[in-house]
Amino acid sequence: MAKPSHSSYVLQQLNNQREWGFLCDCCIAIDDIYFQAHKAVLAACSSYFRMFFMNHQHSTAQLNLSNMKISAECFDLILQFMYLGKIMTAPSSFEQFKVAMNYLQLYNVPDCLEDIQDADCSSSKCSSSASSKQNSKMIFGVRMYEDTVARNGNEANRWCAEPSSTVNTPHNREADEESLQLGNFPEPLFDVCKKSSVSKLSTPKERVSRRFGRSFTCDSCGFGFSCEKLLDEHVLTCTNRHLYQNTRSYHRIVDIRDGKDSNIKAEFGEKDSSKTFSAQTDKYRGDTSQAADDSASTTGSRKSSTVESEIASEEKSRAAERKRIIIKMEPEDIPTDELKDFNIIKVTDKDCNESTDNDELEDEPEEPFYRYYVEEDVSIKKSGRKTLKPRMSVSADERGGLENMRPPNNSSPVQEDAENASCELCGLTITEEDLSSHYLAKHIENICACGKCGQILVKGRQLQEHAQRCGEPQDLTMNGLGNTEEKMDLEENPDEQSEIRDMFVEMLDDFRDNHYQINSIQKKQLFKHSACPFRCPNCGQRFETENLVVEHMSSCLDQDMFKSAIMEENERDHRRKHFCNLCGKGFYQRCHLREHYTVHTKEKQFVCQTCGKQFLRERQLRLHNDMHKGMARYVCSICDQGNFRKHDHVRHMISHLSAGETICQVCFQIFPNNEQLEQHMDVHLYTCGICGAKFNLRKDMRSHYNAKHLKRT
C-alpha cells in the first residue's frame, strides 16, 4: 500500500535542499538576483527548461533570464509552485504570474489563485505528517537518519551528550552545577551518562564524523570541512551560533578584564613560533580531556575515588568550557629570523642574457662594442662595393641604449600614432581596427576591396598605389630601413637589393671573425631568409639563385594566364541582379546581399528578442527562436525525439541502426544495405534537363547549365 504523503515529503526535502543550495546543479539569474535549483525538477515541471537542458547539456551551469520579462518575485513563486505545488504568499499580480508560467511552458498552470490555495490546503494535510517527523536535525536540507529504537529510549542520553542551547544566567548556572551532583541522579541514569561520555565526549572528532559523513563539521550550522584548520577559522565567523554564545562571550570579556585569565597569556608566551597553527588551536580550543584535568585540580582526590565524581567533574568542565571563547593568536612577524632559512641569490646581467632565446650567445663586457657604417670601396672596374667597418667604440651607457632600441617589439611614438588613423573622406580619427567598419558604414559608395588581398580601399589614388604594391615581395631588408626615401630608391634600383643582401652576409662573416664568436649560431637567426633571398612576386615562393626565380616566373605567369582564361569562360550569371560592391559576389535577392555584408563588417545585426543574443546570419536567429518555442525541425520517426540541428538528428538516427543497415542523410530513410542506398540516392540528385548530367548540389547543376548550355541557346 503506497503512502500518500511520501511524494509531498520528498518534494519538501528537495525544497529544503534548494534553500540550502545543496546538490543544486544550475543557477538562474534575473537581474542581480540568483536562484539555485535542480535541473531534474525544472525539466519535470517546464517544457522550456526541458528543451533548453537537452540542447545545452554542457553549458547550463548558469542561465540568465533577465531579458525574458519575468520578475524575480514571479520566478520565486514559480519555484515554490514547482517544488511544493503551492505558493507561500499571494503574488502582487496574478495575471503577470500566470503569463510568466505560460512563458516558461509549465505543464500545470492554475486558472485562478483559488486553485493554488486549495492545493495549499490539501497538501498541508499531507505535509503535516511529514513535517511532524522532521524534529530531528537537518543538514543542507537533508534530514539526518536516526534509529527509531534509540530514539524511543531514554531522552537523558541525548540530554547528557548534547550541550544546552538556552541562555544561562549566573544564578541558573550555579543551580545547574548543583543539580549535577551525585545525589540528584538516579542509578540507571549514571550508566547512560557514563556510556555516552565515554563514547562521545572522549573523542569529539569521532562524534562529529559519525554525525555527518565528513571529518570535521560545525555543530552550529552543519557545514563540513576537510581539515581542522578550516573548521577553526569557520567557528570564529560562524553566523548561526546559539544565543548562549553571546552570553558566554560577555562573561569571558569580563574575566579577562579582571585578570583571571593571566594563565592564558602565559601559555601564549611559552609557545614557539615554529609550531604549526593546528597544534596551537588544539592547545587553546580546550578539549574535554584538558578541561577535565583543569577541573580535577579543584575537586582534589574525589576525582580518582569514585566514578560519580568523574561525571560531576566532567559536567563542571563543560560549564567552564561554555564560559571560554576561542582566542586566535598569530606569531609575531620577525623577518630577520625568517630570512635565515632562505638562500639569497643575486641575479646578474649574465643570467638575464642566458634566459633569452639565444642561449648560446655569451656577452663579454670587457670587449668594446663598435658601431658599423657603410663605406663604398671603388675598385679599378668602378664597381661599387659596400662593406661594414668599425667607426668608433661605444660606451656602456650608449651600448645599453642601443640594445634597448634593437628589439622590434618596443613601441615607438610613431607606432602609437599609427594606431589611431584618420578617415581620408571625413577626417574622423579612429583606431585602425574600426577604420574598415567606418568606411563600410559611412562611405560604402566611395570604397572598394582589393581582389588579391581583400583590403578595403578608397577609390582613386589609394587604390592605384595599393594595386602597384600588392603582390610584391617584402623582405627584411626593406623593413629594416627606417627612411621611406631609401625604400623608394631600393625599389627603383633592384641591383642594389642584391648588393645589400651580400652586405648582410659579409656582416655575418665580420661578426664571426670579431670578438663575439657566434660560430654556433646559424645565419637564419639574424636574417631569416638569407639562405633564399630571391622571391617570386606572384606566389611568394623563395629561391637561392636568381636563375631559379626566372625559370619559375615563366611557368607561374602561364598558370595565371590559364586561370584568367577560365575566369573569362565562367561569366557572371545574368539572373543574379544584386552584386556586392566590395567583392563582386552576386545574389538573387536583395535580402541575401544585405546578409552578405555582415561577412565584411562582422556585425551581428540579427538580435533575439527573447534573450538578446546576437547572430551573424538570419537563419541562425530562426533556429534559435525555434529553440525558445520548443519547436523541433527534425523528429525521429521511431521514438519521436526532436532535434533542432540536422547533424544531431542524423547522429540520433544512427543509434537506431542495426548491424549492416545504413541511413540516407537527406531524407533519413533506413536501408538494409549500401546497394539499396546507392539506388535511392539517385532520387536526391539534381539532373540537367538538357544533357541528363546529375549533381549532388543544386548550385553545381546551375553552374554546369550556365557554362555548357546557356551560350549555345
Swiss-Prot record:
Residues 24-91 form the BTB domain. A zinc finger (UBZ-type) spans 533-558. One of its GO terms (molecular function) is protein homodimerization activity. The modification Phosphoserine is found at S355. Pfam families: BTB. Signal peptide: none annotated. The keyword Ubl conjugation applies. Residues 160-179, 270-320, 384-416 are annotated as: Disordered. GO terms for cellular component: nuclear body; nuclear membrane; nucleoplasm; nucleus. Transmembrane segments: none annotated. Changing C536A: Abolishes binding to ubiquitin; Abolishes recruitment to DNA lesion sites. Its main location: nucleus. The modification Phosphothreonine is found at T356. InterPro entries: BTB/POZ_dom, SKP1/BTB/POZ_sf, Znf_C2H2_sf, Znf_C2H2_type. Acts as a transcriptional repressor. Represses cAMP-responsive element (CRE)-mediated transcriptional activation. In addition, has a role in translesion DNA synthesis. Requires for UV-inducible RAD18 loading, PCNA monoubiquitination, POLH recruitment to replication factories and efficient translesion DNA synthesis. Plays a key role in the transcriptional regulation of T lymphocyte development. Homodimer. Homooligomer. Isoform 1 and isoform 2 can homodimerize. Heterodimer of isoform 1 and isoform 2. Interacts (via BTB domain) with TRIM28 (unphosphorylated or phosphorylated form). This is Zinc finger and BTB domain-containing protein 1. It comes from Homo sapiens. The gene is ZBTB1.
